[in-house]
Amino acid sequence: MDVLFLSRLQFALTACYHWLFVPLTLGLGVVMSVMETIYVVKGDEAWRRIARFWQKLFGINFAVGVATGIILEFEFGTNWSNYSWFVGDIFGAPLAIEGILAFFMEATFIAIMFFGWEKVSKRTHLAATWLTALGTMISAWWILVANAWMQHPVGMDFNPDTVRNEMMDFFAVAFQPAAVIKFTHSVASGWMTGAMFVVAVSAWFLWKKRNEEMAKKSILVASIVGLVGTLLCMFAGDKHGVDIAKNQPMKLAAAEGLMQGSNEAPFSIVPGIEVPHMLSFLATHDWNGYVWGVEDLKQVGEEQIAEGKVALEAFRTYREHRDTNDSIAQQALATFQQHKAYFGYGYLDSTEELVPNVPLCYWCFRLMIGCGCLVALCFVLALFFGYKGWLPRYRWFLLLCMLCLPAVYVAGQCGWIFTEVGRQPWAIQGLLPVKAALSSVSAGSVLTTVILFATLFTALLIAEVRIMLKAIQQHKDEDLVVSD
C-alpha cells in the first residue's frame, strides 16, 4: 500500500463517518423546529414534550458530528499539503466563514435551545431552535461551496510565481450554480434522513405499543418534511445531472457504464435493462442530445494531456530562468499562458488515468436512486396511513419504516461515494490530480493515523448509537395529552 492509496483511504474513511452524522443533524433540526412551532402556535403541551424528546437526540448526534468534522478539516494540512498550498487561497475562505459564522451561531443558539426552556419566553426559545437549525444549513452551505469549487473551479487565476491559485471573484466561487445545486441536493437529502429517523423511531414505539400518541404525531410531521425533502432532492438531482453532463462528462459516463457516446443514449436501470433515449434526455433535456462515452473522452484526453505536458514544461522553464534569463522566462511564460487551461493534465501519464472506477460509480448511483425511491414511498405511505389513523393496524408497514432507516443512509453514502470517486483522478477537476496533491509523508505514518482514526470514529459511532438507543428505550410519555 503506497502513500496515495493510504491517504485516499484515510480521507474516505473520515468523510464517510462524518456524513453519518451530518444529514441527521440537518434533517432532525428542521423536524424538531416544526414540532416546536406547532407547540407555540397551538399551545399544546404534548407538542412541547415531543419537541424536547427529538431535541435530545439531535444534541447527541450534533456533538459527535462536530468531533468528526474537526478531524476531517485537519487532514487537508497533514496528508494533502500540496493541495492546501495550491488552492488554499480559495478553498480556505468558505471553510473559514463556516467556522467563524455558522459554527459560532450554532454553538450560541444550541445552548439556549437546550437550557432555556424555563428561562426564556416560548417565542424566544422557538427562535433559538430555528436559528440552530439554520446554523447547520449555513454551515453546510459553505462546506458545499468548497466542494462544488473542487468539482467546478471558477473565480480564480493561477499565479506561476507563487504556484498558487488566487481568488479573483469571491461571488463567483460562493454562488456559482454548481454550489446552489449541490447545497439543495445535499440538504434536501439530509431532511429525508432526519425525517426517516423520526419515522423509524416512531414506528418502533408503535411496534412496542409505547408512546403511541407521540409516535403518531411525530410520523405525520416527519413524513411531510421528508416528502418536501424528496421533491427538492429530485429537482436538484435533475439539475445536478445536467451540470455533470456539461462539466464532468467522464463522471456521467462512468455512472452509466457508457463506453461510446451517442445521440440516443439509453439509461441503464441494471445491466441488460435499458430505457431508450432516457439518458440523453436526463443529461441534456433533449431526447436526442449527445452524451459523451468513456472511450470518446479518452480520445479527447490524449490531446489534453499533450497540451498539459507543454504547459508543465513551460512552467518549469519559467521557474528555472525567471531570475537569470528574462527573455527565456518571458517566452516560457507566454507558452504557459497559452496552454495553462490543461496544466493539470500534464501530471497524467496516460488516458487510462482519466477513467474512474466505473463499476463502483455505476452501482453506487443505482443504490442511491433505488434506496431514495424506497424511502420516498415510505414517506407517502406514512403520511397516508397516519392521516387515516391506520398506522398501528399495519405492522408490516411499521417494520418497513424501521428497515428504511438504513436505506436512507445507504443512499446518502452511495451518493457521496459516486460524487467523489467519479471525479477521479482529480482533486480539483481539470486543475490538480490527486497524486500531485499529496504531502511528503511516509506510508507508515499514514497507516498509523488510518488505524487510529478508524478506531476513534468507530468508538464514537458505537457510543452515539448506544446513547441514542438508551434515550429512546427509556423514554416514557404515557400521559401525553391527545390534542385534536
Write out the residue ranges for each language-model feature.
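Polytopic transmembrane helical bundles with strong interfacial aromatic enrichment
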Residues: 1-484
